[in-house]
Amino acid sequence: MEQAPEDQGPQREPYNEWTLELLEELKREAVRHFPRPWLHGLGQHIYETYGDTWTGVEAIIRILQRLLFVHFRIGCQHSRIGILRQRRARNGASRS
């Protein structure tokens, strides 16, 4: 009968500790790019929906990751990552 291999690798950081560190990092980044009252409202919504649970922590992590991804993808003025918007010529000469 097959058996799962023994875990011989280095001890991984506990999930809860890693998750809280990730949340803190995302919050620090989000504050640099979004208004504090807006982020506070998001936090209140998550708290009212999930309470003080790990499900709420995971939900706000997912939301902040998506918001920051889209924000950078659209073209954050603080970042070199993103879509470069080019002005189009009115006469259509730049079309190929």
Curated annotation (Swiss-Prot):
Keyword terms, alphabetized: Activator, AIDS, Apoptosis, Cell cycle, Host G2/M cell cycle arrest by virus, Host nucleus, Host-virus interaction, Ion channel, Ion transport, Modulation of host cell cycle by virus, Phosphoprotein, Transcription, Transcription regulation, Transport, Viral penetration into host nucleus, Virion, Virus entry into host cell
PTM comment text: Phosphorylated on several residues by host. These phosphorylations regulate VPR activity for the nuclear import of the HIV-1 pre-integration complex.
Subcellular localization(s) per the UniProt record: Virion; Host nucleus; Host extracellular space
Residue positions, PTM Phosphoserine: S79, S94, S96
Biological processes annotated in GO: DNA-templated transcription; monoatomic ion transmembrane transport; protein homooligomerization; regulation of DNA-templated transcription; symbiont entry into host cell; symbiont-mediated activation of host apoptosis; symbiont-mediated arrest of host cell cycle during G2/M transition; viral penetration into host nucleus
Domain of life: Viruses
Signal peptide: none
GO CC terms, sorted: host cell; host cell nucleus; host extracellular space; virion component
Keyword Lipid biosynthesis attributed: no
Pfam families with a match to the protein in the record: VPR
Region (Homooligomerization): 1-42
Other remarks in the entry: HIV-1 lineages are divided in three main groups, M (for Major), O (for Outlier), and N (for New, or Non-M, Non-O). The vast majority of strains found worldwide belong to the group M. Group O seems to be endemic to and largely confined to Cameroon and neighboring countries in West Central Africa, where these viruses represent a small minority of HIV-1 strains. The group N is represented by a limited number of isolates from Cameroonian persons. The group M is further subdivided in 9 clades or subtypes (A to D, F to H, J and K).
Family affiliation: Belongs to the HIV-1 VPR protein family.
Role summary: During virus replication, may deplete host UNG protein, and incude G2-M cell cycle arrest. Acts by targeting specific host proteins for degradation by the 26S proteasome, through association with the cellular CUL4A-DDB1 E3 ligase complex by direct interaction with host VPRPB/DCAF-1. Cell cycle arrest reportedly occurs within hours of infection and is not blocked by antiviral agents, suggesting that it is initiated by the VPR carried into the virion. Additionally, VPR induces apoptosis in a cell cycle dependent manner suggesting that these two effects are mechanistically linked.
Summary of subunit composition and partner proteins: Homooligomer, may form homodimer. Interacts with p6-gag region of the Pr55 Gag precursor protein through a (Leu-X-X)4 motif near the C-terminus of the P6gag protein. Interacts with host UNG. May interact with host RAD23A/HHR23A. Interacts with host VPRBP/DCAF1, leading to hijack the CUL4A-RBX1-DDB1-DCAF1/VPRBP complex, mediating ubiquitination of host proteins such as TERT and ZGPAT and arrest of the cell cycle in G2 phase.
Name under which the protein is recorded: Protein Vpr
Organism: Human immunodeficiency virus type 1 group M subtype C (isolate 92BR025) (HIV-1)
